[in-house]
Amino acid sequence: MEAPNRTIVEQMNALPGTDYPATIGGQIETPRGVLFMGDMTDSSQETDWREFERVYGLTGRDGLLKYPIYEAIGNHDIIGDSPIRAHVKRRHGALAYSWDWSDVHLICLDMYPDSGTRAWLAKDLAKIGRTRPLVIFFHYAIEGPYSDFWPQADKEALAQALEGYNVLAIFHGHFHHAGHYAWNGHDVFLPGSPRHASHQFLVVRLSASQLAVGFWDFDTRAWRDAFAKSIQR
C-alpha cells in the first residue's frame, strides 16, 4: 500500500494554490492539518506504525506530508496486543481528545463514542458552550454499509449528546467509500481510502459563512464532487 499512500501525500502537499471546484470557488490555502479517520495500520503491528510515520509523518516535519496529522483509532489498529493505542495516547493524551483551530473546536471521539467517551464528551462540550462551531470525527460508520460495528443505542445517545450544539460536520472512516449523508440533522462525510475503488480524500474549507467540502480523486487528479452549505460562526 505504500505506492498509493505516497500518491496521496504528494497530492496533498501540492494542494495550496489549487482551484476549488467551480461550485465552491476560490483557491486552496495551506491546510492546517489532516484528520485521519483510523486504520493507520493494517494489522496493528509496530512495523505498520513505523511505515505510517515514514510515509505520512505525524507533525508535518517528520515524514513526507507537510501538514500535521490528527488521528482516530480504527479497528485495524487494535488487533491483539496492539501498540498503536499507546502511540496515539502518547501523542494526544488520550484516544478521545480535542483542540481549537481559531474559533472552531475539533473533537476526536476514539474509534466510536461509547459510554466512557460520551462522558468525556459531555465534559468537553460543557467547557465551550452551545454556539461554538464543532467538527467531530471518529472511525466507525453511523449509517450505511458496515455501520453495525457499534450499537444503535450508542448512536442514539450520541445524537442526544450533540442536540443543541453547533455541529458543522461529522467525519468517519471504516467504509472504504467517499460520500456524504445526513444523520440527525448533521452533515456526515466519508473520505474514501487507498484500498479498494474509492480513491478520494476530502479538502475542507471553513469560512465565516460557509462549510465547503471538495472530493479529490487521486487517481484522476481531479475533483469528483463538491458540497457547500451556509453556516454560523
Label for each model-derived stretch:
Residues 38-39, 74-75, 139, 173-174:
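Active-site glycine-centered loops adjacent to acidic/histidine catalytic or metal-binding residues
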Residues 1, 145-154:
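Short, flexible/disordered intra-domain loops and linkers
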Residues 27-30, 215-224:
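Short, solvent-exposed aromatic-acidic interface loops
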Residues 136-142, 168-178:
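Histidine-centered catalytic micro-motifs
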Residues 1-48, 233:
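N-terminal active-site segment of His-dependent metallophosphoesterases
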Residues 24, 128-146:
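Short acidic, glycine-rich surface-loop motifs adjacent to enzyme active sites
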Residues 10, 45-133, 154-166, 177-214, ...:
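Extended active-site neighborhood of metal-dependent phosphoesterases/phosphodiesterases
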